[in-house]
Amino acid sequence: MSFVHLQVKSSYSFLQSTINIKEYVRYIKSLGLSTCAITDHQVLHGAYEFYQICKQEEVKPVIGMSVDVYLNQEQRPLTFYLYAKDFKGYQSLVNLSNLIQLEKERVTLKHILQSEQVIPVVSFYDTFVEELIYLDDQHKLNEIVDTFNQLQHFYVKVDPITSSKNLVTEWFSTRNDLKKRLVLMCDVRYLKVSDRVGFEALYAMHQSTTVSNVRREANVGTHLLTLNEIVEQFGQDWERAQKRSVEVVDQCEMTMPNNGLIFRHIRRRMVYLLMNI
């Protein structure tokens, strides 16, 4: 295997994906793949279900979560994709999710540094960094990249799948310090090409807009590309970035204890939801 999808939202990301977890895992298995990941935004509602189904289907589960992270005094966040190396890493993700959902706090780089056993992947796409690249503000860009040197190890997302994202993707070609960290990721929101229509309707509700407007934003979401489609899309381009997706998941070995510990996060979320009905 030379590629693993590391950016997959499920239907637990409210109105942002049509992906049913059971269908997703079984589809991965039908493609002859042995690993799959989940990265809902700032929530872990589907994590345990995902883990159980993966174990039933004999597919390796990689539990992740996307998080808005604020740097220094910046009021606009970057997106971090965080992957649990093990159960300790999963607990770190739970703590971050609780910090956001229950305590209504912003996640900072300090919180990431304090999170044990997680693998961070930084995304500059659809963030204020695009503006800095456009303005060619090299001083500020260098300052941001230097900030990440506090992390023991991190990767950087590259997503060349749509032309509208060329600004960030082309910037990477000027950054030798980031090239060795690039990992290929695609924003998977639905399983098959035929599911696009349903996703567009769902996402239109999420954005309080029309389906026509969503269709004009061709870069919003994609289906789960097969390995053949990845090869057709990129050929030998980004080959190392593709392989780094496997490098990431090779560091993840999740085993959840078969006891009540796993339900603490679920119970807290249920109480929170009931109090806010």
Placement of each model-derived feature along the sequence:
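Short, aromatic/basic amphipathic alpha-helical patches
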Residues: 50, 134-135, 143-147, 168-178
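Short acidic/histidine-rich active-site segments
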Residues: 181-194
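Helix C-cap/helix->beta junction micro-motif
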Residues: 57-59, 178-180
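Active-site-adjacent beta->alpha loops and helix N-cap segments on the catalytic face
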Residues: 21, 43-53, 164-171
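Residue-level marker for buried hydrophobic side chains located in beta-strands
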Residues: 4, 37, 182-184
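Conserved active-site carboxylates
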Residues: 1-11, 20, 24-35, 59, ...
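Catalytic metal-binding/acid-base residues of hydrolase active sites
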Residues: 42, 68, 189
